[in-house]
Amino acid sequence: MQLNVNDAQAIEVSELTFGGEFNETLVHQAVVAYMAGGRQGTKQQKTRSDVAGGGKRPWRQKGTGRARAGTTRGPIWRGGGVTFAARPQDHSQKLNKKMYRAALRSILAELVRSDRLVVVQDFAVEAPKTKDLLNKLNGMGLSDVLIVSDAVDQNLYLAARNLPHVDVRDVQGSDPVSLIAYEKVLITVSAVKKFEELLG
């Protein structure tokens, strides 16, 4: 199949990588797994056994008329532990490499189908100036955009850093969430070739 390039002639690309069916279930699974992997999972609360003190029983077992109590750190006591205390946990989900690659192929194909993939021969700025990048993007009619190149250009990265709806990634740093989060994905021809190598 052919992909139109903004400032040059169309290029031939793999049907497998850029022309497959959209598998919504697989893409959803990949997005959930990616976001779950980003969770810290470090919150922790104290149970009755973690709270300091409470070793001595507050009153004797019998003869007081009060309910029996063996510690002052039980969950029903002020200053006591939490009943079902949160514990650190690993939220990450396993996703096979084959499935992850298939999800990325599915996303790329859908971007092509929905005219959200803008292919250019090359994309760079001469100096790390946000204004220069903004003018360049405005000239192309792009405001909410992910810029993907085969290697991150330092000037481009610094210029885009302060723009809220613009992000710069290389092919290796692209993930399912970032690829679908933006209105348009601006990608260089070299990045297209690299995606074909990785996902073909």
UniProtKB/Swiss-Prot annotation:
Signal peptide stretch: none
UniProt superkingdom: Bacteria
GO cellular component, one term: ribosome
Segments forming a coiled coil: none
Keywords, in A-Z order: Ribonucleoprotein, Ribosomal protein, RNA-binding, rRNA-binding
GO molecular function ontology, one term from the record: structural constituent of ribosome
Family matches, as InterPro entries: Ribosomal_uL4 (IPR002136), Ribosomal_uL4-like (IPR013005), Ribosomal_uL4_dom_sf (IPR023574)
Any one biological process term the GO annotation gives: translation
Spans annotated as Disordered: 38-72
Pfam family, one: Ribosomal_L4
Quaternary structure (record): Part of the 50S ribosomal subunit.
Protein family (similarity comment): Belongs to the universal ribosomal protein uL4 family.
Entries under HAMAP family matching the protein: Ribosomal_uL4_B
Protein function: One of the primary rRNA binding proteins, this protein initially binds near the 5'-end of the 23S rRNA. It is important during the early stages of 50S assembly. It makes multiple contacts with different domains of the 23S rRNA in the assembled 50S subunit and ribosome.
Record protein name field: Large ribosomal subunit protein uL4
Species this protein is from: Pseudomonas putida (strain ATCC 47054 / DSM 6125 / CFBP 8728 / NCIMB 11950 / KT2440)
